[in-house]
Amino acid sequence: MKTLLLTLVVVTIVCLDLGYTLKCNQLIPPFYKTCAAGKNLCYKMFMVAAQRFPVKRGCIDVCPKSSLLVKYVCCNTDRCNN
């Protein structure tokens, strides 16, 4: 009985992921990385002249402002920067 209870506690801890971390796509979407502590946004960066293809993707702490040449799109859920 104690073994069953211990197993349930361990499974619960693993499933809850107590130290939640964000996962963001890298430049090639099938590949993603787990963001470091404090990096709570995913981002996608485009060149304004060619918005069809992102130049960079990853984790970031603050979403940068877009400029005349570069556009940033940020989000805060797992792998949302497709």
UniProtKB/Swiss-Prot annotation:
Disulfide bonds join 24-42, 35-59, 63-74, 75-80. Its main location: secreted. InterPro entries: Cytotoxin_Cobra (IPR003572), Snake_3FTx (IPR003571), Snake_toxin-like_sf (IPR045860), Snake_toxin_con_site (IPR018354), Toxin_cobra-type (IPR054131). Expressed by the venom gland. Transmembrane segments: none annotated. GO terms for biological process: killing of cells of another organism. It comes from the Eukaryota. Keywords: Cardiotoxin, Cytolysis, Disulfide bond, Membrane, Secreted, Signal, Target cell membrane, Target membrane, Toxin. GO terms for cellular component: extracellular region; membrane; other organism cell membrane. PROSITE patterns: SNAKE_TOXIN. It is found in: Secreted; Target cell membrane. Residues 1-21 form the signal peptide. One of its GO terms (molecular function) is toxin activity. Belongs to the three-finger toxin family. Short-chain subfamily. Type IA cytotoxin sub-subfamily. Monomer in solution; Homodimer and oligomer in the presence of negatively charged lipids forming a pore with a size ranging between 20 and 30 Angstroms. Shows cytolytic activity on many different cells by forming pore in lipid membranes. In vivo, increases heart rate or kills the animal by cardiac arrest. In addition, it binds to heparin with high affinity, interacts with Kv channel-interacting protein 1 (KCNIP1) in a calcium-independent manner, and binds to integrin alpha-V/beta-3 (ITGAV/ITGB3) with moderate affinity. This is Cytotoxin 6.
